[in-house]
């Protein structure tokens, strides 16, 4: 969000929907460390649609920020955050449609005590999940590569 025209466009769209510009922070380019530190300013991450987050969702959850998403429809990429939330024990953060997305955003943002509890424990919870277990991922990926190699050898004998 380094471009002032684009920033203004985004803020105007929020203001048209009764969201004050004072409650919006648009960050520009930054170092990786600064980027991750920005998550400390966020209560809830709102997943965009129809193209949901991927790495940004993992980063938000890792930094203790719950991500509200809308159930994906026909494209793989529309299901990424839905899958991440489901596997992170955050299924209640998946809305079935736009109306539920809005109502959940209002509901979750209104319960500061619950948000604080989630933020405090989210990283601990995710560390126990397979999707955040890098050793398990590496082991499974290695196994898959060997299976592919074995099939290749058999097919090319």
Model-derived features: positions:
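Conserved active-site histidine-acidic residue motif and adjacent donor-binding/catalytic loop
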Residues: 24-37, 52
